[in-house]
Amino acid sequence: TSFHYRRLEIFKLLSYPSKVDVMVTHDWPSRIYQYGDTTQLLRRKPHFQDEVNDMCLGSSPLMSVLDELKPAYWFSAHLHVKFAAIYPHFHSKSPAHPQSAETEPENETAYSHGHPPAAADGTTRFLALDKCVRGRDYMQVVSLEVDSSCLEDNKLYYDADWLSVVRETQQLETRDRKPLPLPDHLTISEETKQVVENLVKERGDGVRGIPIPENFQQIAPLYFGFSTDGYDGTVAVERGNNQTDAYLEMLGLEHRITVPLEESGKEEIGRAHV
């Protein structure tokens, strides 16, 4: 599972201008435990006590994202325990009355089209689930209201606002160990606005946005070997991807931390582990 992130990724999320319905992360936002049944959480996971006392359980950057984007729902993993919380955004941040994971507020409505307010009551409903093994509480069904147009096909679509953020921050991507300084705020240039607007006109379907192409292709040989010590004697090579090539070309961007597919296999980047 990928759960490490850079300041740039957090900056990009904080720069997203529209409402978000659902966030899915590995880590919990920090201090989210204060807005659920903390006593029950510590009863199940007593080794969390020191981190709770020090107010360092969870990710501070993700709490910034939670406060900024205010999604209707936030789902996390990582801590291998089922836990629910209701986080208020527009009133006192005092921990709410503990809610169980099974408790649903009345008249709950969530949306997934057109970026209306994330939740009518100005809260985020947080849910983490237990480890996916027998006898653990690892599943819960959550129903969301969606626009009927979202159900007409099984395709995924690019989000125009996110494309603008990606295009405007590409110059901040670097392979150097020292990251480039980030601006205080992200301003979307007129050029980027025009590029994305043209993409929506030329490639969009007029309703849901720009369809993500189904252009998967095999870019590396299949692996059939096995090594008990985790090393098969080969050297891993950096490989490009046709989907990355197409994505960058669509936005008029160059490779900065990736390589084109046609250059795959030319640069050694370490050993291959299995």
Regions found by a protein language model. Give the residues of each.
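Extended recognition/assembly regions associated with phosphoester-bond processing machinery
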Residues: 1-271
